[in-house]
């Protein structure tokens, strides 16, 4: 089974994806890590690489290619990515979107990155604006359209362990009814 975990910065997607991969003994791949590795090789931070990526689609294509290689080669995979839910949905089994209000995400990032809350807010707003513009320009994706996701979870009041339990419960329910209902079946009920 291939599962995508998407969401904005600070939503908990990396923590949840790692824990879920461990629980299921699945391989874990992070688009964020691939992107950070590219930034490091180029001597840039994330914000500046995002700025470069606004005009250089090759950066995103490198990340996408790497993820797609994993999709083709792995049977059991957790993909953590901002946009994989939109890009690779047809090649995966389940797509999950995690989110939380801006203030909560900023607080998480401030603690994680040891920066001020104001710096975290500024960083998130810049990144999200750049993502929105870039993903719309290069992919035609509206990151506010969550209709491609099977499950959307507000992570603000739930810890990582319980989010993973919720996802595992969902996966169990889905595996009991793997075939989607046909329109005729819905109308007959």
Swiss-Prot record:
Pfam families: Cytidylate_kin2
Domain of life: Archaea
Alphabetized UniProt keyword annotations: ATP-binding, Cytoplasm, Kinase, Nucleotide-binding, Transferase
Subcellular location: Cytoplasm
EC number: 2.7.4.25
Reactions accelerated catalytically: CMP + ATP = CDP + ADP; dCMP + ATP = dCDP + ADP
GO MF annotation terms: ATP binding; CMP kinase activity; dCMP kinase activity
Binding locations of ATP: 7-15
One Gene Ontology cellular component annotation held by this UniProt entry: cytoplasm
Example of a GO biological process term: pyrimidine nucleotide metabolic process
Family of the protein in this entry: Belongs to the cytidylate kinase family. Type 2 subfamily.
Protein name, as recorded: Cytidylate kinase
Lineage: Archaea, Thermoproteota, Thermoprotei, Sulfolobales, Sulfolobaceae
């Amino acid at each position: 089974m291939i599962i995508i975990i998407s969401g904005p910065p600070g939503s908990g997607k990396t923590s949840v994806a790692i824990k879920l991969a461990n629980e299921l003994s699945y391989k874990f791949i992070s688009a964020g890590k691939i992107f950070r590795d590219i930034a490091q090789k180029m001597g840039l931070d994330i914000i500046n690489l995002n700025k470069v990526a606004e005009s250089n689609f090759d950066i995103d294509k490198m990340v996408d290619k790497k993820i797609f290689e994993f999709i083709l080669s792995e049977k059991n995979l957790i993909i953590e990515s901002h946009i994989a839910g939109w890009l690779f949905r047809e090649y995966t089994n389940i797509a999950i979107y995690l989110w939380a209000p801006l203030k909560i995400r900023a607080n998480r990032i401030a603690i994680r990155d040891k920066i001020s809350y104001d710096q975290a807010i500024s960083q998130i707003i810049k990144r999200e604006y750049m993502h929105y513009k870039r993903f719309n320009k290069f992919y035609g994706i509206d990151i506010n359209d969550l209709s491609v996701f099977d499950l959307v979870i507000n992570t603000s009041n739930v810890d990582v362990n319980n989010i993973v339990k919720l996802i595992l419960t969902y996966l169990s329910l889905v595996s009991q009814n793997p075939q989607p209902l046909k329109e005729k079946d819905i109308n007959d009920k």
